[in-house]
């Protein structure tokens, strides 16, 4: 699975009915991450899992006699929810999932493929019912541009004076674009053009324009889930804002490839930005005149691909000479990232 937590967790749901014993492995970064919260509900289907204390590598023995389950997902993990949905698709009977609001790509795909799914939307939770067994039709699918990848260049544009960026054909699923709303509240100008539906998902072209005055923010927690992968970048924008920005209820960031709140604080400290970090919040004292004229070294970050790429964006935005280790950390999620950075004129050794 490389260092892809999404691939690792989703494939476990698909392997619940495997007739062969399967061993799932990942790189060092992924092997440090917790898989127990997806293993536990999948065991209820009847499959057997032998793991390294809830971590990779994991041995899976599928079941021929799976039974539908009831599952309460209260962390807002789309990966866990989707893994259970995939397992339910090949299980006779109706599986019922009560899930905290999270990304809904799997639900939209199920609907587009006309698979047997019912969704009742509540205030904070969705009730999802999946009926199995059901064959999945084949389809050709061209994946739209990923907002999490686009966000690096959106933030670089936001932090670069007199800049305009256009990105074509970006997935603007409402459960993914919290970063738009947060950046707009901070004064960044983002507009959507040519909005259309593509196989259940909304896509659009994006226009991003920088601003001379970035505003501080008391970030509404309603955007946390839909911006969870972009917060490291958002914190860079807060570093350049006028005033104090506050972000809370972000303990989920510490369940990623590295404890990202801690690493955000470290990066901010290195660039001279005062901040106060707790287990689930961070307060950032912005400096609109921020400019770096020293050497900065970023290493020992558990090969978290987003820490690497965020550090590159910080270097381009704030100046200075940066030495950033472990560039191989981006090989799974964004292998062409440095080529795109090089195209923009950055000097990379």
Give, region by region, the residue ranges found by the protein language model.
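Structural preference for solvent-exposed beta-strand-turn elements
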Residues: 1-349
């Amino acid at each position: 699975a490389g260092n892809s937590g999404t691939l690792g967790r989703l494939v476990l749901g698909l392997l619940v009915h495997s007739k062969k014993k399967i061993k799932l492995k990942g790189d060092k970064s992924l092997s440090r991450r917790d898989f127990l919260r997806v293993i536990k509900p999948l065991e209820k289907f009847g499959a057997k899992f032998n793991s390294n204390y809830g971590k990779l590598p994991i041995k899976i023995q599928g079941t021929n006699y799976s039974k539908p389950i009831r599952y309460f997902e209260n962390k807002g993990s789309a990966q866990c929810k989707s893994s259970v949905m995939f397992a339910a698709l090949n299980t006779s009977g109706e599986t019922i999932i009560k899930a905290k609001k999270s990304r809904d790509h799997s639900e939209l795909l199920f609907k587009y493929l006309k698979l047997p799914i019912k969704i009742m939307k509540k205030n904070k939770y969705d009730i999802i019912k999946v009926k199995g067994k059901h064959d999945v039709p084949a389809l050709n699918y061209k994946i739209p541009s990923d907002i999490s990848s686009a966000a690096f260049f959106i933030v670089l544009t936001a932090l670069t004076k007199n800049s305009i960026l256009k990105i074509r054909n970006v997935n603007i699923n409402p459960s993914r674009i919290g970063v738009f709303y947060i950046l707009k509240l901070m004064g960044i100008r983002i507009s959507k053009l040519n909005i259309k539906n593509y196989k259940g998902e909304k896509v659009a072209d994006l226009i991003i324009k920088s601003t001379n005055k970035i505003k501080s923010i008391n970030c509404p927690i309603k955007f946390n889930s839909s911006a969870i992968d972009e917060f490291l970048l958002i914190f860079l924008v807060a570093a350049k804002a006028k005033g104090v920005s506050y972000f809370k209820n972000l303990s989920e960031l510490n369940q990623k490839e590295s404890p990202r709140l801690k690493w955000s604080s470290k990066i901010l400290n290195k660039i001279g930005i005062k901040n106060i970090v707790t287990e689930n919040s961070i307060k950032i004292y912005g400096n609109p005149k921020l400019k770096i004229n020293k050497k900065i070294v970023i290493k020992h970050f558990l090969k978290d691909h987003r820490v690497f790429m965020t550090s590159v964006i910080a270097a381009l935005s704030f100046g200075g000479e940066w030495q950033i280790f472990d560039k191989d950390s981006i090989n799974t999620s964004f292998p062409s990232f440095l080529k795109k950075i090089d195209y923009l004129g950055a000097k990379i050794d």
